Amino acid sequence: MMGHAWLKHREALLALVIILMIGAIGSRAPSFVSPGNLVEMFNDTAILIILALGQMMVLLTKGIDLSMAANLALTGMIVALLNAHYPGIPVVALLALATLLGLLMGVINGLLVWRLGIPAIVVTLGTMSIYRGIIFLLTDGGWVNSHQMSADFLSLPRSPLLGLPLLSWCAIAALLLVGYFLRYSRTGRALYTAGGNATAAYYTGINAGKMQFVSFCLSGALAGFCGYLWISRFAVAYVDVANGFELQVVAACVIGGISTMGGSGRVLGCLCGALFLGVINNALPVIGISPFWQMAISGAVIVMAVLLNERGNRGHGRLILRNAALARRKQAVKS
């Protein structure tokens, strides 16, 4: 029962926990709850939100993409190098290029998983190392710093619009677009079916492998998009940019209730999971707790979330099997 209750109300519970955390920390450090700091905290979490949306779509199909941070680092380095050497290239063109390069890396992951049948975790661990290696080959271990980047390249994510930086609006737009895609498009709904019930997917003409390919393409494109956003926000590009950040991305999804077994999860949960980690990241230094505790806290929450998610999913799986058996009996009676 607890698992079912968690699955049904996880977003509300997470939102409540986030509000309580902000309130508790604000009671000790009033500046933490100032409007400016709350806006900055959301802005700090924006890239995590976008990446988590991409990871969510892969998880829905029973896959996982551990190469997202390496994809981000490689695309970010490429556009940073281009900007440093050819500052006249429009920033919008560089942003589009980063997205297309990320899409290409997603295509590579998707084809290896779909066509060759290699487990997603193996493929993306391999491509993660390959992408990092390519960065080293391109730069010989060197850096691209803010002095080499143009003012337009650095200013775009920081540009204010209706009280929020453009980076925050990118995250909001991604939430709305992915939410619409998963809820109302045929392909979006097929991602759920492909990961949640392979038998139902087969009988309804959905190619589960192809849906995994689509999810990796979308994940790669979002990672590439974030490549420019990350580099321009932090004004530096080097081999180890966002190293290990893929674990934060997976954590945001799992905490938000996206099942690692596929077919279950919502965009709102993904948002709440990312915000939960964002609050922790910003709160620990404020209250004087070592950042290393962040890893321990995140790990404990991930384990708890996985246990609750999978407990609920077992009951959901039994319901699917029961309905499938009933449908087969009805079909047998008709024939």
Language-model-detected regions and their locations in the chain:
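Transmembrane helix-bundle core of multi-pass membrane transporters
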Residues: 120-184, 211, 233-242, 320-335
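Transmembrane alpha-helical segments in multi-pass inner-membrane proteins
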Residues: 223, 233-298
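Short loop segments and helix-boundary regions at transmembrane helix junctions
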Residues: 2-6, 59-64, 85, 103-145, ...
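Single transmembrane alpha-helix segments in multi-pass membrane proteins
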Residues: 21-87, 111-118, 253, 257-267, ...
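Helix-loop-helix "hairpin" substructures at the membrane interface of multi-pass membrane proteins
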Residues: 89-94, 98, 104-109, 113, ...
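Structural signal for alpha-helical transmembrane segments and their membrane-water exit/capping regions
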Residues: 17-33, 135-139, 179-186, 308
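Cytosolic-side transmembrane-helix boundaries in multi-pass membrane proteins
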Residues: 1-23, 203-210, 284-335
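Hydrophobic alpha-helical transmembrane segments
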Residues: 11-16, 41, 49, 70-74, ...
